[in-house]
Amino acid sequence: FEDSELPAVKTVEDILRSYVNDYCQDLMEQRIAEAVDPQLDFAVRIIMDSDLSDLKYLYAYGEYVSANERGVAEFLNSLSQEQIDSMAETYTEGYRIGFINGRKDITRKKTVNIRYNLGFERMVRSAILKFRAMGLEPVIYRHATHVVNKRGNARIGFTGSVANPQYDYDHRQDQALFLDSDFVQRKLRSMQNAYENYKELAAVHGGPACIETFGEKPFVPETKAEAWTLSETQQKQQVEIDNESGQIVNRYIKGDERSFTIIAYPIPEIGEKFPEIFAEIVKINTLDYKLYERIQQTIIETLDTCQWVEVKGRGGNETDLIIHLHGLEEVKKQTNFENCVADVNIPVGEVFTSPVLAGTGGILHVKKVYLNGLQFRDLKLVFDCGQVIDYTCSNFETEEENRAYIEDNILFHHAKI
């Protein structure tokens, strides 16, 4: 092909647009099947059938395997089965208790979606057995790799390490190549049809049980002019897809019937004391939730006497918020707050509420935070009537880049949130 003329850029773009439109239904169908059908058990078979003492099993997934995945697997292999089972018990019991505390009937569910990073297979194997004892079969799928199904650079599902975070970030808006009003309708119609085809399986799906990780080196992306970016019109179209697809999911996997749990562990990249840190995290994850439930109830009973809560930062933190609480007619019988212990969010705990929007406002300042694998420095969100009206951070040299970074990765192009 040395003498062949290269196709024009527009020709290649048109071919890719046609491909995406032609195969949208097939891609959505496959993705939704993976999300609810336990018979699609590629990952389950690796977990349950492999010799986990031989780390070659990690390469059976087809994912990038780094020192983190190998290090976690080696460390878990050094633990006793009793220790592994204890970790799995904390994780699975958090899921079960989440249903109880949410007054939801777990016996109506038949599947649970397990999400994890490679290396945690010993724990996941034990968890699968415990979930099965509850009557739940595992549904485990790979993070989305096709642009039709991806959500920015988020990795939802089982995953290895990210070989090149900048590459993932650069390609987070590749849908800008083909996103238009016709595709919006095509994708939503494909999603609706796929869920209708799998509605029986979707109805008995219980929701996700997530094993997250922390300790990786900070990644601060660069803005590349060559990367695809959504136009203003496409941003609105993406918001429409996100909103409508969420409603479709909720019709078939009802929000008032499903639950979740999240637990997190360090990875070797955190430093030389990884084993010690991991052991301490295990202890934290198994704190006596009944004790903290009582402690947090004292906080709730105090806050329930208030109409307003003022939150101020210190030590250079500029947070200055005032939060308007709902009035309670009978303080002894009513409360504004949820006493959340080690169920859906492990470890304990948190006390949270949904405030009155009118009168709730101010500045939330976080010096450093990680969201979906991205670092935000000096993140500031300004609220008025409970909505974000202004925002900035210090990741980039220009204010335009900083605002765009927040719009893309926190606000997701909503005008207000």
Regions from the language model: what does each represent?
Residues 1-358:
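Active-site bordering "gate/hinge" segments
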Residues 326-328, 367-369, 384, 393-396:
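Histidine- and/or cysteine-centered catalytic micro-motif in compact active-site loops
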Residues 342-380:
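Conserved AWS/pre-SET-to-SET junction and N-terminal core of the SET lysine methyltransferase domain
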Residues 376-393:
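Active-site and channel-lining beta-strand-loop segments
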Residues 391-417:
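Dual-mode signal for accessory low-complexity, basic/Gly-rich regions
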